[in-house]
Amino acid sequence: MVLFYTLHTTKRRRNMKKQGFGTTKDGKEALLYTLSNKNGMEISVTDYGAHLVSVLVPDKDGKKRDVVLGFDSVTGYETDGSHFGATIGRNGNRIAGAAFELHGKTYQLAKNENNNNLHSGPDGYDYRLWKV
């Protein structure tokens, strides 16, 4: 997020491009936002799950290199369980048995990794279409 803030200020807004990133399983259009700066750096973020899709930085010879793992369309993020570049929430990591106790009350969560809840399950932040 610090990187995002550094690249995206009101003054630099003209350096933001928006383009289609595919259609979600439920028929909604996902968008890709690409921000760039004067140093040749670019980041791309999709509104689907607020995934960081790519970070292009110039190498020692000035050639741009992508330094993060990501997919070319929203389909990859919907079907692959790796959570590349994901905004994770409400909980991160695994909750064993997909249940936890708080103040004497047991809460059952959705199971999405064997018998566990991983990164908030199938309704985590990384599976939602965000408003930008």
Please provide the spans of the model-predicted regions:
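Short, Lys/Arg-enriched N-terminal segments with co-localized hydrophobic residues
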Residues: 2-15
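Surface-exposed acidic/polar loop and edge beta-strand patches at domain peripheries
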Residues: 15-132
